[in-house]
Amino acid sequence: MKSHNAPITKVGVILRPSSPELKTTFLQIKEELNNAGIEVILESISGGMIELLGRDFHQLATQCDALFSLGGDGTLISMLRRAFEYELPCMGINTGRLGFLTALMPQNLHTFTSHLKSGDYTLQKHLVLQARIYSTLNTAYENNLDNKNQTPTQTLIAINEFLISKHELSGMVHIDASIDRKYFNTYRCDGLIIGTPAGSTAYNISAGGSVIYPYCRNILLTPIAPHSLTQRPLVLSDEFMLEFYAKERAKLIIDGQEMIDIMPSDRVQIQALPQSAMLMYPPTRDYFSVLKEKFKWGEEH
């Protein structure tokens, strides 16, 4: 969605953890934004890292018009999850390596500051997945599929993907999958990615999944090292509600950043949320040019 967006006059900034070397870059970015009439507030944990004052995340999210991350895609994804409930636009300034989701490099910010102040930027909506964990101890599988009133023990969101992975180093994980409460398949594999289009260029692509245009509303199912060659990646509409049982102890990994244990007595219910994560980009950004650059498509080898 281009132009006619709210002008940005105050931004909160979060830095990649354990990166005190970002202090110089942050101060340069702060100066550029201040010169454009945009106030900059640093998050308190980031501030402690570089010995500057900051405010806690809730203050940032409630007082600022937008949030900027300084780091790579991982820093941006972490910030998006934290900012999701506040419905704030977010932008990534890339100091990492690949940077599919980040908007620009620090040295290019000066070309974009006037656009921020006038509201001339692109605001893209990214699908977000929610996982609910239900304990089904001593209850039959079929009965629990119909138990709509059960309270989840945990509720989580993912920007890129949820990964159900084997708990031990050896062996496979066996995962029963249902779509809209109907048994669909048993995956025998090292792990199963339940991903978003934005995450299709992350772990999903390494596991043989398709690249999906990031602003589509799809859910990706991609098995990792499946036991059977017929277990292929699957792209679904966002309307489906998915449920998974791991038949042995397993791990649920969220965006590669958090991990929880799941037991054979746990049911993992995953579906797309109607609310989206909002990412800001310069109005000139072209996704296919980004793909071409990052994957080096069209180059002679």
UniProtKB/Swiss-Prot annotation:
Record localization: Cytoplasm
E.C. no: 2.7.1.23
Listed InterPro entries: ATP-NAD_kinase_N (IPR017438), ATP-NAD_kinase_PpnK-typ_C (IPR017437), NAD/diacylglycerol_kinase_sf (IPR016064), NADK (IPR002504)
Catalytic residues (positions): D73
PANTHER family on file: NAD KINASE (PTHR20275:SF0)
Cofactor or coenzyme needed: a divalent metal cation
Gene3D superfamilies: Probable inorganic polyphosphate/atp-NAD kinase, domain 1 (3.40.50.10330), Probable inorganic polyphosphate/atp-NAD kinase, domain 2 (2.60.200.30)
Protein name (database record): NAD kinase
Coiled-coil regions, chain positions: none
An MF annotation (GO) of this entry: NAD+ kinase activity
Keyword flag Kinase: yes
Family: Belongs to the NAD kinase family.
Main subcellular location: cytoplasm
Residues bound to NAD(+): 73-74, 160-161, 188, 190, 198, 201-206, 225, 257
Gene Ontology biological process: NAD metabolic process; NADP biosynthetic process
The keyword Methyltransferase appears for this protein: no
Catalytic activity: NAD(+) + ATP = ADP + NADP(+) + H(+)
Keywords: ATP-binding, Cytoplasm, Kinase, NAD, NADP, Nucleotide-binding, Transferase
Role according to the record: Involved in the regulation of the intracellular balance of NAD and NADP, and is a key enzyme in the biosynthesis of NADP. Catalyzes specifically the phosphorylation on 2'-hydroxyl of the adenosine moiety of NAD to yield NADP.
Tree of life domain: Bacteria
GO terms under cellular component: cytoplasm
